[in-house]
Amino acid sequence: CPLLFTWLEQVQANNKNGEIYLTDIVELATQAGSKVACQIADEAEIAGVNDRADLAYLEAVLQTRLRNSAMQQGASLIAPETVFLNADTIIGQDVIIEPHVVIGPGTQIGEGSIIKSFSHIEGSKLGACCVIGPYARLRAGTDAGDGVKIGNFVETKKSTIGAGSKANHLTYIGDSVIGADVNVGAGTITCNYDGFGKFKTIIEDEASIGSNTALVAPVKIGAGAIIGAGSTITADVPNDAIATTRSALDVRQNAAIRYRNQRYEPS
């Protein structure tokens, strides 16, 4: 409408906020003798954002819509008001999301997966029937295959994790490629940063990493290899090998009694 541009030039910022309101065109059109019609819209669709309170209100509206859409498409949100989604989140059929979960941009969750409470996921792709959390953090670049388990207080970043693999507790997996059916024991750390650059850890199919292990990248653990608990691995381990770096156990009989006597001996 050519007249629209004419009226736009006449709109003034003569209101308490000093803003230009497009809706002032209605008054100008009426004054010019034009016929004016209106369509009733959802209030939230045309609401303005003048402060952080307005922004929070509209964010809540958006979150409600995203939650409802996810549930209508087959996901179960146990306490919907506590789950936060992103506009581009893709959630498969029969996914269960427990309370207090945050899903950031670029996340895809495969069908039948379970996201347990207090987990944070962003920039990640999960296959079918994964179990995540509680208290898990999946950072950008995480790509988990079908049936992967990432448990409590586990953090992943820029890592591919093969089908059926699991890291159930207290683990950091960064810049890694993990094969299928790998077990990563509690307290395992992929030491990917030397203060200057990031390096890759590779763990091949069916390897088993013992608890409290440090894998100093770049390093490769071969298929079927076993890493003993408490080891620090700084070199590649061949397929089906067992690698340990623990010191020998030193047991001193009755030494605890002598130690206590020395500590509490009157001066």
Q: How would you describe each model-predicted region?
A:
Residues 78-150:
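Acidic, glycine-rich loop-and-beta core segments that form the ion-binding/anion-interacting portion
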